[in-house]
Curated annotation (Swiss-Prot):
Domain of life, source organism: Bacteria
A GO BP annotation: mRNA catabolic process
InterPro entries: ExoRNase_PH_dom1, ExoRNase_PH_dom2, ExoRNase_PH_dom2_sf, KH_dom, KH_dom_type_1, KH_dom_type_1_sf, NA-bd_OB-fold, PNPase
Entry's family note: Belongs to the polyribonucleotide nucleotidyltransferase family.
Localization of this protein: Cytoplasm
Catalytic activity: RNA(n+1) + phosphate = RNA(n) + a ribonucleoside 5'-diphosphate
Lineage start: Bacteria, Pseudomonadati, Pseudomonadota, Alphaproteobacteria, Rhodobacterales
Pfam name, any one: KH_1
MF terms in GO: 3'-5'-RNA exonuclease activity; magnesium ion binding; polyribonucleotide nucleotidyltransferase activity; RNA binding
Domain S1 motif per the UniProt entry, residue ranges: 625-693
Enzyme Commission number(s) of this protein: 2.7.7.8
Annotated residues for binding of Mg(2+): D490, D496
Protein name per UniProt: Polyribonucleotide nucleotidyltransferase
Length: 711
């Protein structure tokens, strides 16, 4: 009934298996990839006809993590998987980016790739397994895909690169300082297609070495996919790239002069208007048949690309007049918004971000329910890209895939310089509002985020800056690497290469290639040119702010204290009675974790001190021989009980009240009376023994034995 094909190799410390022919047989391509005990099913389907008027390539990649894969039941009211999580969205983008450039140019049929996590061993991250499965499924599907590709994750510890580090190793690099890198690389046999990383100030050489290490590591996986395809791939789909050379020639003849003049305008808004006018001129010169040609958009783009790309490679001058390695003018401002905790306006040419930092407490941490466990994050970065930032009227709604991806890129860049939670016990939320955009808005978020956090008083290890690089690679092998690319250069170029870091090293790197890959030599030159740009931007940022500022009066203050874990119950009290009383009396917010770390938060320093003192009085142990002020809470025949140390009571025996014989303690004491007592010690049962007669009740000074009156 089944025509199964299964291939396996030893990859790293695990066995990687690809199998097809048993599940989802009606899909064009279906592969289950298994690494260790982590399994992902990838299914590929594609339309056999192009939709009329389709002028772009409609590739959609979905990645789903099923809770059953880790033996879990989803939370929430409905108890089922709902909209994609941030991890699922980011992984879908991770898979999409290296696949998209490898479809035959001109193919515009709809393609759907669905990756479903079926089993998770809590050791191997499913994202790389999903990428391998998707590539294998496309390779055997018959779709016009010029793959395969494969992906690998690389760590860096003690100067050694590590292939496929575990989920726990990569969970939070801030908590694992020995592990300095989380790098994902995807590529073909000959070239790297995509890079994504979070790093802890790695040098350019170390980062390039990691990319080369990953590219070498994926070669056996590529051979495995090819081996699978040789046994079971479907017949290639009958598709020939459309020949629209005559249409391209007509478009060029009709408007090359106008288009070239439009691209000579440096101002974005004026250039956009001029380009639109040039397109209208071209349309007016074309026949009705040419206007209806579905390849007209591609012909237009080809003309624009040839003008922009050719001028840069031949003359070294870009459309805004800059040299290839020149950064646009930068203006940095901080402290713009009076009621926020920290704010910055970062402007680089026609790209601008208003970035705001808010400091919160432990209650504000983000709770993340992942397949490999539940955890909290005390650093949040949200990126917003409204339509007005590019002068358009468009949809406004929840963040899309692009906004989530750009926000995560900026998060990775800044994560490496945050102080440890034990040193800075705040939840930090950074929001980047992109107010203008003409290329590299995610890197503006990195620069603005660094400025904003320093303005809020966050003690960063070092400022961080980011720059977006571009590449124009011509067919004859000539190329130009561009620093701080514009939107048009991104749109019409061959590479989007974003690098962020401190003066000491790289903290984040992301690379997307629109062609069949670049060589290590080009990547090395791009990294060196990016470093020069990054150092320049850091210098411009330093003119505005160089370190953490004083806290805003509107920001909460947080004091931390460590108590013995066996005292946690006493601080909380029965049903939370004690801690509620502390909060009500002091006015501060109090948070206790299972390790006995207490965070006391309030904008009011007096409230923090009050809560701190109340907690200290509960958990601290009274010292023998010390004098305390207490209150008589109960009188009995043999003495009086005095509350003297927070909630602690001790007995003053009748013989220790005064230096004379008393008939009854009530002769000199009454309930509610304030007295001074000395802690004599503890009896055999641990009960506290106190004395009043050795303390001057007015001054609180201890009475020396020779000063004490005789009985």
């Amino acid at each position: 009934m089944f025509n199964e094909t299964k291939k396996s190799i030893e990859w790293g410390e695990e066995t990687l298996t690809l199998e097809t022919g048993k599940v989802a047989r009606q899909a064009d391509g279906s592969v289950i990839a298994t690494l260790g005990e982590t399994s992902v099913m990838a299914n590929v389907t594609f339309a056999k006809k192009q939709k009329p008027g389709q002028d772009f390539f409609p590739l959609t990649v979905h990645y789903q993590e099923k809770y059953y894969a880790a033996g879990k039941v989803p939370g929430g009211f409905f108890k089922r998987e709902a909209r994609p999580t941030e991890k699922e969205t980011l992984t879908a983008r991770l898979i999409d980016r290296p696949l998209r450039p490898l479809f035959v140019p001109g193919f515009k049929n709809e393609v759907l790739v669905m990756c479903t996590v079926l089993s998770h061993d809590l050791v191997n991250d499913p994202d790389m397994v999903a990428m391998i499965a998707a590539s294998a499924a496309l390779t055997i599907s018959g779709a016009p895909f010029m793959g395969p590709i494969a992906g690998a994750r690389v760590g860096f510890e003690d100067g050694e690169y590590i292939l496929n580090p575990t989920v726990d190793d990569m969970q939070d690099l801030r908590l694992n300082p020995e592990q300095r890198l989380d790098l994902v690389v995807a590529g073909t046999k000959d070239a790297v297609m995509m890079v994504e990383s979070e790093a802890y100030e790695l040098s350019e050489a170390e980062m390039l070495g990691a990319v080369k290490f990953a590219h070498d590591a994926i070669q056996p996986v590529l051979d495995l996919i090819i081996d699978l395809a040789e046994d079971c791939a479907k017949e290639p789909f009958d598709f020939s790239p459309p020949d629209y050379s005559e249409l391209s020639a007509a478009v060029k003849a009709a408007g090359e002069t106008e288009m070239r003049a439009a691209f000579a305008i440096s101002d974005k808004q004026e250039r956009t208007t001029a380009v639109a006018a040039a397109r209208e001129t071209i349309m007016a010169a074309l026949s009705d048949e040419q206007k209806e040609d579905p390849n007209l958009g591609s012909a237009m783009k080809g003309l624009e690309a040839s003008i922009l790309r050719g001028d840069v490679v031949k003359t070294g001058k870009r459309i805004d007049g800059r040299k290839t390695d020149e950064i646009r003018d930068i203006v940095c401002e901080t402290g713009l918004l009076p009621r926020t905790h920290g704010s910055a306006l970062f402007t680089r040419g026609e790209t601008q971000g208003l970035v705001v930092t808010t400091l919160g407490t432990g209650d504000d941490e983000q709770f993340i329910d992942a397949l490999h466990g539940n955890f909290k994050s005390n650093f949040l970065l949200h990126y917003n890209f409204p339509p007005y930032s590019v002068g358009e009227a468009g949809r406004v709604g929840p963040p899309g895939r692009r906004e989530i991806g750009h926000g995560k890129l900026a998060w990775r860049a800044l994560q490496a310089v945050l102080p440890a939670a034990t040193d800075f016990p705040y939840t930090v939320r950074v929001v980047s509002e992109i107010t203008e955009s003409n290329g590299s808005s995610s890197m503006a978020s990195v620069c603005g985020g660094s400025l904003s956090m320093m303005d809020a008083g966050v003690p960063l290890k070092a400022p961080v800056a980011g720059v977006a690089m571009g590449l124009i690679l011509e067919e004859d092998g000539s190329y130009a690497i561009l620093s701080d690319i514009l939107g048009d250069e991104d749109h019409l170029g061959d590479m989007d290469f974003k690098v962020a870091g401190t003066e000491a090293g790289i903290t984040s790197l992301q690379m997307d290639i629109k062609i069949a890959g670049i060589t290590p030599e080009i990547m090395e030159k791009a990294l060196e040119q990016a470093k020069a740009g990054r150092i320049h931007i850091l210098g411009e940022m330093a003119k505005s702010i160089t370190g953490a500022q004083d806290f805003s009066i509107h920001a909460p203050r947080i004091e931390t204290m460590q108590i013995p874990t066996d005292k946690i119950r006493e601080v909380i009290g029965s049903g939370g009675k004690v801690i509620r009383e502390i909060v009500e009396v002091s006015g501060a917010k109090v948070d206790i974790n299972d390790e006995g770390i207490i965070k006391i938060a309030s904008p009011n320093g007096e409230a923090i001190k009050k809560a701190y003192d109340m907690i200290h009085s509960i958990v601290a142990e009274p010292e023998e021989g010390m004098v305390y002020t207490g209150t008589v809470v109960k009188i009995v025949d043999f003495g009086a009980f005095v509350n003297f140390f927070g909630k602690r009571d001790g007995l003053v025996h009748v013989s220790q009240i005064e230096n004379r014989r008393l008939n009854h303690p009530s002769d000199v004491l009454k309930e509610g009376q304030e007295v001074k007592v000395k802690l004599l010690g503890f009896d055999d049962r641990g009960k506290v023994r106190l004395s009043m007669k050795v303390v001057d009740q007015e001054t609180g000074e201890e009475i020396k034995k020779e000063e004490a009156p005789a009985d």
